[in-house]
A protein has these predicted regions:
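Acidic, metal-coordinating helix/loop segments flanking the phosphotransfer/catalytic sites
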Residues: 18, 33-51
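Short hydrophobic/Thr-rich beta-strand motif most characteristic of the beta2 strand and flanking loop
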Residues: 25-35, 43, 92
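Acidic catalytic/metal-coordinating carboxylates
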Residues: 36-39, 62-65, 84
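Receiver (REC) domain active-site loop signature in two-component systems and cognate sites
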Residues: 58
Length: 105
């Protein structure tokens, strides 16, 4: 099974992602649930995942900062997807420049 990390500061969003999607039937398992980028980096220091799905706007470290840190410091080669309500093209450009696989509004 492929390991997935969910990163979002909204508990209802995290809960919804875990319950609504049938991860197992797609060959995925939720390996970690983090409420901000710093928590995600802490988890990734000792663990590997195959896919990171992250919100953009979060306290302490946002999703774009998380993506940039992971790529710059070569912390993980996991596919990275941003799931957000921000439709600002600058966010999209910044995400793509840093290797974001997908940007879901």
């Amino acid at each position: 099974m492929l390991k997935v990390m969910l990163v979002d500061d909204e508990p209802y969003t995290l809960q919804g992602l875990q319950v609504i999607i049938d991860w197992e039937s797609g060959g995925f398992e939720i390996a970690a649930v983090c409420s901000n980028g710093k928590e995600a980096l802490k988890y990734l220091a000792d663990n590997q995942v195959d896919l990171i799905i992250s919100d953009i706007k979060m306290p302490e470290m946002n999703g774009l900062e998380l993506l940039e840190t992971i790529k710059r410091e070569k912390i993980s080669d996991a596919a990275f997807v941003l799931l957000t309500g921000y439709d600002d093209f600058q966010y999209t450009q910044r995400a793509i420049r840093n290797g974001c696989l997908d940007y879901i509004l």
